[in-house]
């Protein structure tokens, strides 16, 4: 009888034991879920145009909040000083030269070669739901649009810039409507484009909150036309023109970034989501941008320029509970580096093809880690630049300028005559690089 009772007890214990194993397996699976990743990419934002970068006349609490919850970079460079090639660096982890697109995509061009492998393609292959929301500017033919480049979902405009209410291409005529959702033209006349972006992102997050997702949230702001909210236009009314118009538009942008972050919080995904923030390049001084408004702070130059004001940009990464918070990194890093960094953080196998980016995880985790790059090259029109360590050489035709950046942030003292050996060294390395990519300087 006692033996039979023992058997009965074992029979009742066994299901409980199996249940425990099942629960432990479920917990392990949940804890092993890979993080979501969102890249917030602003357009034409100046080098220091955030409070945390030293701006005293701007209200940017949401951008600053990301810095408080993450790591902020002080020597972060875009891959190029203009829109399209900068985005090539971000999307492919390759320099614009290796990515096949040196300048902005003209209307009669296909765009970035379709054989380039984007971060979205890698994420999608790894089981991520992928979305492009906002500006594209890497091609508007069927083989180069977002849905053909790894994005499950796409909403936004394909060319360089639009009016934020009519959604018409804002450049040379004839102006054309440019708002698309997954290859189909859609119309939201009178609705503010950044608001549409937040709404689209919120719906995508809600739909995919139970699986890992990747969102490329590419704002068309504060790129002209400056269309700040009335409350911010009033708030900044006493700032000098055109800073007042730019500032209002930037704070309007900050509001929408805050709205996006609220969507993540409301979904309960704040601690499960990597947020990366970067401007595509420096602020614009074009006529349509009222010849300025943005600030490079102590730096020289602006959009299109290879001086620091054209290529040194604000950049932040935040992942609460997993990465350092409220810390600053002074190492050199570039927009090409987000590709391998995200791959490592999301535990996705590294790219099998050659990329130029380096994972920033060692730098993110330690202020004493070495810079990701010993040397980096840029090109804009007929000008090229190379930085190695503290030295930067800018060349245009026969003109050469050598700067000691840590001691000359404004690039005002040309040291060509004082350090001819460094000029020749960097000139030689530059020549080798441009020959390797099949381009002359």
List each language-model region with its residue ranges.
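Bacterial N-terminal signal peptides
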Residues: 17-26
